Amino acid sequence: MTDILQEIIAHKREELVERQTRLGLAELQAAVALTAPPRNFVGAVRARMAQGQPAVIAEIKKASPSAGVIREDFNPVTIAQDYAAHGAACLSVLTDEHYFQGADLYLAAAREACPLPVLRKDFCIDPYQVWEARAIGADAILLIVAALSDAELQSLEATAQSLDLAVLVEVHDAAELQRALKLRTPLIGINNRDLRRFVTEIETTLKLLPEIPRERIVVTESGIRSREEVATLRAAGVGAFLVGEAFMRTAQPGDALQHLFFD
């Protein structure tokens, strides 16, 4: 685990204690019982790919540790609607407050504003957070292999499956990929950002792609900024793309999405 990821996870453990003190698991489970059924995240991705189109998971992100504030004019409702109107298959919403200036309320607001399934983009380390994701309206969660043991990955995936939540499992290298492939989820995310050097290279996805069984869905993440990169990845067989910063830095995120993938 890299220094920044270790720092984030350590802070997340402290935050988790505070959250559990404010709202116990039994209360959280009672809240989940009152929520509407999840939207089909995997189905939305598969449907777009079946049409021969890229499945774009469009991200709503205000800030990051590496870039600072990315978007000052930040309204998750209008951004979600803009993405939905310009071809996004799903949304990803940052909910980590300390490092990404995200919020659970942003996810709830974005989901209510459009019909798309929504991924909770956060650092999930405990089953409590899976129940929490379901309670705030998420349809999918992220599991980062670099931050979790095999036993933790399997436990968190099992909890997600019991709640009908999709799982996007994220890897950075071949060793992490082999661990991810032990899980049942079809969604394999390849993060092109090297957490040690903080550079992004789509070659990371291209290098790992041949190791992934065809029945899995490859989601390439981070650093996709040009139509040439999209064309290269599509030609290699990548069907799904998680993109955020490239859209968030523009005046009209939906237009940027359409230009990058569909014009």
Curated annotation (Swiss-Prot):
CDD domains, per the entry: IGPS
Pfam families assigned: IGPS
GO aspect biological process, one term: L-tryptophan biosynthetic process
UniProt keyword Electron transport, yes or no: no
Disulfide bond annotation, renumbered to this chain: none
Recorded superkingdom: Bacteria
Entry annotated with the keyword 4Fe-4S: no
InterPro entries on file: Aldolase_TIM, Indole-3-glycerol_P_synth, Indole-3-glycerol_P_synth_dom, Indole-3-GlycerolPSynthase_CS, RibuloseP-bd_barrel
Reaction catalyzed: 1-(2-carboxyphenylamino)-1-deoxy-D-ribulose 5-phosphate + H(+) = (1S,2R)-1-C-(indol-3-yl)glycerol 3-phosphate + CO2 + H2O
Record keywords, A-Z: Amino-acid biosynthesis, Aromatic amino acid biosynthesis, Decarboxylase, Lyase, Tryptophan biosynthesis
Enzyme class: lyase
Gene Ontology MF: a single term: phosphoribosylanthranilate isomerase activity
Pathway(s) annotated for this protein in UniProt: Amino-acid biosynthesis; L-tryptophan biosynthesis; L-tryptophan from chorismate: step 4/5
EC number: 4.1.1.48
PANTHER family to which the protein is assigned, alphabetical: INDOLE-3-GLYCEROL-PHOSPHATE SYNTHASE, TRYPTOPHAN BIOSYNTHESIS PROTEIN
Family membership noted in the UniProt record: Belongs to the TrpC family.
The name this protein goes by in its record: Indole-3-glycerol phosphate synthase
Organism: Acidithiobacillus ferrooxidans (strain ATCC 23270 / DSM 14882 / CIP 104768 / NCIMB 8455)
Gene: trpC
